[in-house]
């Protein structure tokens, strides 16, 4: 499957749908007006374009349509992460992690989570 490349508007819609779906047009209008200040016309135009691109599915629900995501969150996040990593850090995970860890303090839980991830990748037992 081809990597998913989303613009910021598509991220806004999909984040709403990943949290709660299916959603009617009017539910999405309300969600997106509250979240990002969109007008009804912006939401409808974005949904139409996303449906054409295969990013959302629309099914008839009464007099209107109900939308569901056609893209898995993990698939979109993975593609975006790889794109960001390549564009900003020339593909270096170490450089990215170093920059992020230095920029903000990590909690003990976050450090433990990172160690667990590294152990899982390495197949190690944490020793």
Segments (PLM) and residue ranges:
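Short, cationic-aromatic polyanion-contact patches
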Residues: 3-9, 61-80
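Pre-recognition alpha-helix immediately N-terminal to the DNA-recognition helix
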Residues: 8-16, 27, 95
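Short acidic, hydrophobic short linear motifs in intrinsically disordered regions
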Residues: 23-31
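Short helix-coil junctions and helix-kink-helix linkers
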Residues: 30-38
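Short, hydrophobic-biased segments on the C-terminal half of alpha helices
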Residues: 44-48
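Glycine-centered, phosphate/nucleic-acid-interacting loop/turn motifs that mediate DNA/RNA or nucleotide
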Residues: 54
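Short beta-strand "wing" residues that participate in macromolecule-binding interfaces
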Residues: 58
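Amphipathic alpha-helical dimerization/coiled-coil segments
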Residues: 78-124
């Amino acid at each position: 499957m081809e990597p998913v490349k989303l613009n910021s508007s598509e991220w806004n819609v999909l984040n709403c749908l990943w949290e709660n779906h299916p959603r009617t047009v009017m539910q999405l209008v309300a969600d997106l007006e509250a979240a990002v200040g969109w007008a009804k016309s912006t939401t409808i135009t974005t949904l139409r374009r996303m449906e054409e691109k295969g990013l959302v599915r629309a099914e008839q629900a009464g007099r209107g349509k109900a939308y569901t995501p056609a893209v898995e969150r993990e698939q979109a996040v993975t593609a975006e992460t790889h794109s960001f990593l390549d564009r900003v850090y020339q593909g270096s995970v170490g450089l990215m992690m170093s920059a992020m860890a230095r920029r903000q303090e990590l909690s003990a839980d976050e450090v433990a989570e990172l160690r667990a991830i590294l152990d899982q990748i390495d197949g190690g037992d944490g020793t």
